[in-house]
Regions:
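Feature marks short, surface-exposed loop/turn motifs that line or immediately flank catalytic pockets
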Residues: 83, 143, 270
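Sec/Tat-exported extracytoplasmic proteins
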Residues: 79, 114, 138-143, 225-233, ...
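Basic/polar, cationic surfaces and motifs that engage anionic cell-wall
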Residues: 1-42, 68, 149-299
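Extracellular-facing segments of soluble proteins and assemblies that are Gly/Ser/Thr-biased and enriched
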Residues: 122, 138-139, 143-150
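Glycine-rich, often proline-containing surface loops adjacent to acidic residues and nearby aromatics
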Residues: 132-138, 143, 197-204
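N-terminal catalytic cores of peptidoglycan-degrading enzymes
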Residues: 1-133, 152
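Carbohydrate-interacting regions of secretory-pathway proteins
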Residues: 71, 135, 144-145, 155
């Protein structure tokens, strides 16, 4: 069972299952790009239309790894607004430019879609340079699409989470149940809020209502962050935190382009420069949990 994440051929065992793009169950990034800050590839791959995956070749992996460590210092978290990672990949393939280095499925399975040397166009940030400095992970969660009254992409008469004797659980369509590697699997939120189950907070000016991610996702995410810090030390074990209020901010940061660590798409893009305003990983994400996990990690 593979547990490695890879950058320029360098590997780090993160202690949990990682399905690589080269495996039968894996997903190849449909739209990788070259990073402008790195030189060990054909520069025509930087912003050209997507080519066949095999055409993305690293010339000198050793030099490439040094360049990557010098230029990449953020892990950006996203909710994928999908049922599962296979659903997310399906939508990525339909786009001419979208991609993500990692998918994190409901059951905690991580998928790496390409070598981290390559850029994926997932979060341009308000300065339009965000993808150059970042690694991205799409975490399976429907966000507000799970609420029937707010659902736009997947219209339904009932909420997509159901309250049972054992608590809330996501009602997965059959076509997605069979695509999860750990079967059978019940997607249960790690935390719930009161009787309604979902969390509701303002993120970049919008009230975001959503159920939490799963316990399995949080456990794998913690390991991914720690592993990335070993592989790319510029990605510090640090999350946005306001010392004055003692809280984790949910709006775009003033210093978003200089922040070294783990942050959300909401922290780098509020639409102030003409791009779409972003809210992920949303109101339910437990930033405090990551913060505490990082504090316990030995340097």
């Amino acid at each position: 069972m593979k547990r490695d994440i890879i950058a320029c051929g360098q590997k780090v065992d993160i202690g949990t299952r990682v399905v690589l793009w080269s495996e039968q169950e894996g997903f190849e990034c449909p739209n990788p790009r070259g990073r402008n800050s790195c030189s060990q590839h054909d520069p025509s791959l930087n912003d050209a239309p997507s080519e066949k995956f095999k055409n993305y070749k690293i010339k000198n992996p050793k030099t490439a790894y040094q360049e990557l460590k010098e230029n990449v210092y953020q892990l950006v978290l996203h909710y994928d607004v999908c049922y599962t990672s296979s659903h997310c990949h399906q939508l990525m393939r339909e786009s001419p430019f979208k991609g993500s280095h990692f998918y994190l499925d409901l059951d905690g399975t991580l998928f790496q879609t390409c070598d981290l040397y390559w850029k994926t166009n997932t979060a341009p940030s308000d300065d339009k340079k965000g993808n150059e400095r970042a690694v991205h992970v799409e975490i399976s969660n429907l966000s507000w699409e799970a609420l029937a009254k707010e659902s736009e992409y997947y219209p339904s008469k009932q909420d997509k989470y159901k309250k049972t004797d054992k608590g809330w659980k996501l009602v997965l369509p059959q076509e997605y149940k069979t695509k999860i590697l750990k079967r059978p699997f019940n997607a249960i939120p790690a935390r719930t809020f009161g009787e309604r189950g979902y969390f509701s907070k303002k993120v970049n000016g919008k009230t975001v209502r959503m159920w939490d991610f799963t316990e399995e996702q949080y456990k794998s995410l913690e390991k991914l962050c720690i592993g990335l810090n070993k592989l790319l030390p510029g990605i510090k074990l640090k999350v946005p935190f306001d010392k004055k209020t003692g809280r984790h901010p949910l709006d775009r940061l003033n210093n978003y382009s200089r922040f070294h660590g783990v942050l959300g798409h909401c922290h780098v893009q509020n639409g102030s420069t003409g791009l779409e305003c972003k809210y992920d990983p949303g109101s339910a994400f437990n930033w405090g949990r990551l913060h505490r996990a990082f504090k316990k990690t030995k340097p």
